[in-house]
């Protein structure tokens, strides 16, 4: 066997292995970027020796064989995948190939849309009624997922409107919004269930459940982007026209679809989407560029596994492979001990990553991680980089186990793990320098007491020099004492003292949030402040009384009750008040006297708003007598859903709670 034959055989075997893990097991071992690199290498070798191309080469087909647990559906029209480009030069070369094949000097009109990172599906409607749905599978045969697809609320069971074809097969992507993904993993960590590496895996795992009742509980959604079978009817002769027709029939279509009349316009679209990517609320890994004219598409035709008239222009990879060099343990403000992987530095999504969170001991056990392992690292948007999985097939011989500490790495106190919790905590409290530092950083943060100019490095020095032990000590600092800190001149020191003085005037809600009570975020703090009105009333509340507050269940109520029951906490609060911390007396809102549809209602906001900030919306709702909560429960009266609403919207629909959109909220605010 020639060396190139051996190389081709090994590459094909490796790619088939990873295709099986990705398409069939929903458990990819390597990042997409590494798969793409291997595929490019195979294509280049086959281009050198086309006589060695085999019919079963990964370059000649679409995906992997379907699971036998599902019935199989044969695609009457094959579901092909797209070829990829990864930079401007490659896209421009693709554009030139299309122009040359069309023998045209005029610019092609391109239809550009998002490349969703989910699971491709085919849905068949007969006389407007959904009759079957299937995964892509190997492009020829997929898995019958009809029962599961019927549980996805975004997918209509019956199309509406005029001129619906007798048989219409639409194609699109089932995906999971990021908020829903985070909620699923949060629940899984709490209950010991399966934690998914990323939203794509979670969507695939949710859609390919043998029990549709499980799928129904997952907040999956869907965007339509193409057509397979078309019988007994007509569709527009442009791709954009078809998308608009699908939307008119009730099928969801992404609103980020644009016609581009030049290669430069396509590049501008690509850059704009890349810039907006962190705020979309769902994962994409590029943009899809298609010739808009169906006549030109037909003229261009197909290669073995992809159309010549479309390409996926992919973003820089959000996942890369590297090695874990060590694991260190950090202590947070509530004593939570978090393992952090120290990595061989690697570029991920344009950022050099050298650390990644490992969450807790359970996550380390789930990953099967050892120091020295080769791992896949993921960084999406502003999310802290995390280890997605271990590349077990490439584990070095010299790895060693990760040993979780039995004593706090900072203060030496015992650590404990409460039954039912995933987090291990230091028991040292404020004698622990790390907890003290993090508690004080939280106290002065922008959304808490908002002490301008008091950054993390100042807090670190204040604690290390024993100048500050509790939040009250901050208000006793003088410019003279601050001047002794590193890089702190007299003027800067006086500015910090002035900022501390200004911060004394706050709100009850901010003060509660600044105290750092476990599980009490901004929304819960605002709810407690609004419900009880005064510190005295809150301090003396029972656990049962605390649970009457929207968003407060038994766990949060217990944390709040225990916090105020602790004498040292009450002492610190007394000192803060003695130093002059104050807030306005509560304004009692009589909801009976407010003529507003929001008066007396418990309201939850979810998704992103385009007409006003979330804080403005909360303030206006509260002024009209609404109680704005942070999570959906049986106590919730109304959910306001913005763009890319996730798990909160799904839960509201599950509980039968009224849901309105942003436009309706604005209309009612002005009513």
Swiss-Prot record:
Segment forming the signal sequence: none
KW Secreted (keyword) present: no
Swiss-Prot/TrEMBL cofactor(s): Mg(2+); Mn(2+)
Binding site for NAD(+): 32-36, 81-82, 113, 136, 173, 290, 314
Pfam families: BRCT, DNA_ligase_aden, DNA_ligase_OB, DNA_ligase_ZBD, HHH_2, HHH_5, Nlig-Ia
GO biological process, one term: DNA repair
Entries under InterPro entries matching the protein: BRCT_dom, BRCT_dom_sf, DisA/LigA_HHH, DNA_ligase, DNA_ligase_AS, DNA_ligase_CS, DNAligase_adenylation, DNAligase_N
GO cellular component annotations of the record: cytosol
Domain BRCT: residue ranges: 593-671
Gene Ontology molecular functions: DNA binding; DNA ligase (NAD+) activity; metal ion binding
EC code: 6.5.1.2
Keyword presence, Magnesium: yes
Reaction it catalyzes: NAD(+) + (deoxyribonucleotide)n-3'-hydroxyl + 5'-phospho-(deoxyribonucleotide)m = (deoxyribonucleotide)n+m + AMP + beta-nicotinamide D-nucleotide
Protein's job: DNA ligase that catalyzes the formation of phosphodiester linkages between 5'-phosphoryl and 3'-hydroxyl groups in double-stranded DNA using NAD as a coenzyme and as the energy source for the reaction. It is essential for DNA replication and repair of damaged DNA.
Family: Belongs to the NAD-dependent DNA ligase family. LigA subfamily.
Name the record gives this protein: DNA ligase
Biological source species: Salmonella heidelberg (strain SL476)
Gene: ligA
